[in-house]
């Protein structure tokens, strides 16, 4: 997968959720709020449904800023910890945003020569989502938690999974 654009995000969402939702891969047409326990029941400020295309273009533009291949692994992780929450905060779909953004982030990591520990991310799905919440608070954003798990998940060498434990 090489399409790191809003249309690529829609393609991933449709692939993941096309069997579940008629609207898979299509931007939501309603505004949403999701109460977050981390925010004492308040919601992250997601994009207004009419602003989704513009907000996604802006969020994706951050992916084209750094010279990714010149970064160390730690710098790479720090940079993606700031870019992908911007995409997530748009929340272009009614459901499945975290899974879709993490899938795209995994493809992006692998496109740049690293490997993503899928077992770790799956086992820590709640922590990953909470980390996206904390990294999506505008001036109050906190990236430490997302960086921490991605430093563990983004590896320089292939990850060998124990097939016995996966089944």
Residue ranges and their predicted role:
Residues 1-167:
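FIC/Doc superfamily catalytic core
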């Amino acid at each position: 997968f090489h399409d790191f654009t809003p249309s690529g995000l829609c393609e991933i969402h449709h692939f993941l959720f096309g069997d579940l939702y008629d609207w898979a891969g299509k931007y939501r047409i309603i505004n949403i709020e999701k109460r977050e326990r981390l925010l004492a029941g308040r919601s992250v400020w997601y994009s207004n449904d009419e602003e989704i295309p513009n907000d996604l273009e802006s969020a994706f533009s951050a992916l084209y800023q750094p010279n990714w291949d010149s970064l160390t692994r730690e710098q790479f992780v720090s940079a993606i910890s700031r870019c992908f929450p911007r995409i997530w905060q748009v929340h272009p779909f009614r459901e499945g945003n975290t899974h879709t953004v993490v899938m795209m982030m995994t493809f992006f990591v692998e496109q740049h020569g690293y490997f993503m520990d899928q077992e770790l991310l799956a086992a820590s799905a709640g922590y990953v989502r909470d980390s996206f919440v904390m990294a999506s608070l505008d001036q109050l954003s906190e990236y430490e938690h997302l960086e921490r798990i991605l430093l563990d998940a983004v590896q320089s060498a292939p990850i060998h999974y124990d097939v016995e434990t996966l089944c």
